[in-house]
């Protein structure tokens, strides 16, 4: 009988900074059980588990001779088999063997593309589920223009003929695939392993970013992945250090929103990662308990009157441009709804807009937190060098 060990991964959302002990600002504790299977095959000897700082939705276990086992929190498992090694004959039936090199990935989870870019593994991506016009990352648009990355259809309507003819060897879906399980099943019937990226379910914003380590394992670029993640973790550390040095400053109240085409206001649920980024950046999200935490949707739509009551006295407004497009001035914002002219942040000029690549640059979450922190600071000199936010005049 095979022996399995259950390790409880308790992730306390706290970052201990050298010399100051400043916590992350998030009172979130998430416990998960991800099974460690020491005996997936008589040919492989279990060695260790990858250390993760924030991510809890996956695990990577190392075995002898360079074999790696990726386990996703939904229960799916993938054995990454080195190029010069054989697939063990007695491998557990639920484990999908994936032989390296993996060179023709169909990447439907668009937020993961920046992770491949950050570890110089775009040569491993052959197909995307986002057409060229939908990309705000110039490098991806250029690769599609050159034909190096091909649009192969959305998550619910992949071009099976194209995928098969071009030799797709791995599919990375986003959570939307759960709405069309028949697509996942059909891809599996063709013998193509399908993994679902669950980064959007991570409790801590940097947990999303830490999925780059999984893709480092998949592509043989673990060192590059660690470096890319550490850069973002260092950005957060700098912000928390600055907050510790300025802890007497009151946290500004912050609203993050956009106006829909029919005049309603879309805001993030309190449990979403953006409000958590605002907290880490030193702000206070205006909604203390908005939305059902059990419902995994990220946002809530409300009428302007309700938003007005909660956000009128907010110290800072951040307009989310990723859905309805960018705005360039406070006048343009107020033109969308005259009630915004009454807002404290509008009258003081503390209104910001996100760049449209904010969502797609998933490997810049630490940098985005740093930008938010700069926007919240009273020192005007710290507001000039932001990349993902710009102040409206």
List the model feature ranges, each with a label.
Residues 3-10:
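Sec-dependent signal peptide recognition
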Residues 15-19:
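C-terminal motif of bacterial Sec signal peptides marking the signal peptidase cleavage site
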Residues 20-113, 224-256, 380-393:
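Bacterial Sec-exported substrate-binding components of ABC uptake systems
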Residues 25-28, 202-231, 241, 316-393:
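Structured C-terminal subdomain patch of bacterial secreted/periplasmic proteins
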Residues 68-74, 78-164, 170-176:
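A short, structured surface patch at a secondary-structure boundary
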Residues 103, 110-119, 128-139, 179-182, ...:
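Extracytoplasmic ligand-binding site segments that recognize negatively charged/polar headgroups
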Residues 104-107, 124-129, 170-174, 194-197, ...:
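Structural recognition of the beta-strand scaffold that forms the well-ordered cores
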Residues 239-328:
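Flexible, glycine-rich surface segments
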């Amino acid at each position: 009988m095979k022996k399995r060990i259950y390790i409880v991964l308790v992730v306390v959302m706290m970052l201990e900074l050298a010399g100051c002990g400043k916590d992350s600002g998030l009172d979130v504790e998430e416990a998960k059980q991800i099974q460690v299977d020491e005996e997936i095959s008589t040919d492989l000897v279990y060695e260790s588990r990858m250390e993760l700082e924030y991510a809890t939705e996956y695990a990577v276990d190392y075995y002898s001779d360079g074999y790696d086992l990726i386990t996703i929190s939904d229960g799916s498992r993938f054995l990454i088999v080195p190029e010069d090694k054989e697939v063990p004959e007695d491998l557990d039936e639920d484990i999908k063997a994936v032989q390296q090199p993996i060179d023709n990935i169909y990447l439907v989870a668009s937020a993961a593309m920046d992770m491949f870019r950050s570890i110089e593994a775009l040569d491993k991506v052959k197909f995307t589920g986002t057409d060229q016009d939908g990309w705000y990352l110039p490098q991806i648009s250029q690769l599609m223009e050159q034909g190096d990355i091909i649009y192969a259809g959305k998550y619910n309507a992949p071009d099976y003929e194209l995928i098969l003819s071009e030799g797709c060897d791995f599919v990375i879906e986003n959570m939307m695939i759960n709405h069309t399980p028949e697509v996942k099943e059909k891809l599996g019937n063709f013998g193509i392993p399908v993994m679902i990226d669950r980064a959007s379910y991570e409790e801590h914003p940097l947990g999303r970013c830490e999925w780059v380590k999984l893709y480092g394992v998949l592509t043989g670029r673990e060192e590059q992945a660690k470096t890319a993640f550490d850069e973002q973790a260092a950005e957060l550390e700098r912000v928390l250090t600055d907050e510790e040095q300025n802890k007497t400053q009151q946290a500004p109240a912050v609203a993050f929103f956009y106006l829909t085409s029919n005049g309603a206001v879309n805001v993030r649920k309190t449990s979403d990662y953006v409000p958590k980024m605002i907290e880490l950046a030193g702000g206070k999200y205006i909604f203390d308990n908005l939305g059902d935490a059990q419902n995994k949707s990220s946002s809530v739509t409300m009428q302007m009157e309700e938003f007005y009551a909660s956000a009128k006295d907010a110290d800072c407004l951040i307009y989310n441009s990723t859905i309805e497009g960018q705005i360039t001035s406070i006048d343009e914002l107020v033109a969308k709804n005259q009630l915004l002219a009454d807002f404290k942040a509008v009258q003081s000029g503390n209104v910001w807009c996100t760049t449209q690549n904010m969502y797609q640059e998933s490997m810049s979450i630490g940098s985005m937190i740093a930008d938010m922190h700069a926007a919240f600071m009273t020192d005007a000199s710290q507001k000039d060098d932001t990349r993902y936010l710009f102040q409206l005049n």
